[in-house]
């Protein structure tokens, strides 16, 4: 009986240690992912956009990208960039 209780307590202790390790690893991974997202966000903010992307609002002074065309779409009350059925060349 004492052996069974000791085994159960030991198993619970092992599970607690493993759980703590996984939680610490998950937290480190989460922090690393957050840093990566912030780096990508900062890099994209520095790029100047010359054209409007898909479903973006467009006017004469805000043109759509090459593979998009500016169209009036009902019930939206302004022009938006929609696909012109072509693909951008890379």
From Swiss-Prot:
Top-level lineage group: Eukaryota
Pfam families named in the record: Toxin_12
First and last residue of the signal peptide: 1-19
Tissue specificity note: Expressed by the venom gland.
Coiled coil: none
Propeptide: 20-50
Chief place of localization: secreted
Keyword terms: Disulfide bond, Ion channel impairing toxin, Knottin, Secreted, Signal, Toxin
A GO MF label: toxin activity
Disulfide bonds: 51-65, 58-70, 64-81
Subcellular locations according to the entry: Secreted
Keyword NAD: no
Gene Ontology cellular component terms for the protein in this record: extracellular region
Domain comment as written in the entry: The presence of a 'disulfide through disulfide knot' structurally defines this protein as a knottin.
Family indicated by similarity: Belongs to the neurotoxin 10 (Hwtx-1) family. 13 (Hntx-13) subfamily.
Role summary: Ion channel inhibitor.
Protein name (Swiss-Prot/TrEMBL): U7-theraphotoxin-Hhn1a 1
Organism this protein belongs to: Cyriopagopus hainanus
């Amino acid at each position: 009986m004492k052996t069974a209780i000791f085994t159960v307590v030991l198993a619970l202790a092992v599970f607690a240690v493993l759980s703590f390790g996984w939680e610490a690893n998950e937290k480190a991974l989460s922090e690393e992912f957050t840093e990566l997202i912030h780096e990508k966000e900062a890099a994209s903010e520095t790029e100047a956009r010359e054209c409007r992307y898909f479903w973006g609002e467009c006017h004469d002074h805000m043109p759509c990208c090459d593979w998009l065309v500016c169209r009036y779409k009902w019930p939206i009350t302004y022009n938006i960039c929609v696909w012109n059925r072509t693909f951008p060349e890379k």
